[in-house]
């Protein structure tokens, strides 16, 4: 693995391919591909390559937290020839009804889990199903440990995995030891077939409500599946959770990058020498308080009006004092 920093990019990270030797031909067909990944809110992302757009679990928030200027618009969708909207399951935080209004403006293909309510528009997929959506887009559905499915999309040779609600859902405050063991077994069984795939980019939950072991599922997924790049999601607005996970969990096989700001983007370039060049397309935001004393260090405020309150926790680890679920409304 190699890390380099250049100007004007904020970050320039090269990730050496961890593909097995017998798959060297598959690596060569992926070279010189460029992706743009955009984070919206919670588990919502888009992945764009040339004139193809993938949208996963788009949600504008319970109270419409996603700012208007960061939302997907019909004007944006019209810039693509192929648009695919993936809905992993029917939980409100993974499905915003607005996605079904887009089809009145542009042609859209919806891919939804087979257990969605009757009448839901889209191509239904159950675990084990596979679809060819176009010459450049193929998709497989895998199991989840909650409702619905997880998706693996092959986009012109680049494999993108979105977990949906696949995770090790242990609730240590509420569950018995037996229930936790059953959840662990179910999660391991769900991950097993995914581990047979070669994954370039994975979006995976790190849910702050689970307490100290909030990252148990993500770490196990990284250990077994070894995606080249993992982006945490489903952190319920707790940006510090995602960034701390990225800081602690990156390893030789997998780079971890946290996208935490509405509309934050990264660019991926799959190079001829088997690396992924990762660059930030939205520069870091540092807001300096107007009240600061010029003789003092700048006061950095949290962007997007999201407060980070670590009172009662060790500054280096927000879960150091408890392995019980953290209630977000406290």
PLM features: residue spans?
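Active-site-proximal loop/helix segments of hydrolase catalytic cores
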Residues: 145-223
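Zn-dependent metallo-beta-lactamase
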Residues: 1-53, 60-62
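Beta-strand-turn-beta hairpins that frame and shape the catalytic cleft
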Residues: 30-35, 48-54, 130-139, 152-160, ...
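Active-site environment of divalent metal-dependent phosphoester hydrolases
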Residues: 42, 62-63, 90-95, 117-120, ...
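Active-site HxH/HxHxD metal-binding segment of metal-dependent hydrolases
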Residues: 72-131
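Binuclear metal-ion centers of metallo-dependent hydrolases, dominated by the metallo-beta-lactamase
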Residues: 30, 38-40, 121-134, 145-147, ...
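Active-site neighborhood of phospho(di)ester-bond hydrolases with catalytic His/Asp-centered motifs
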Residues: 55-59, 81-95, 111-114, 161-164, ...
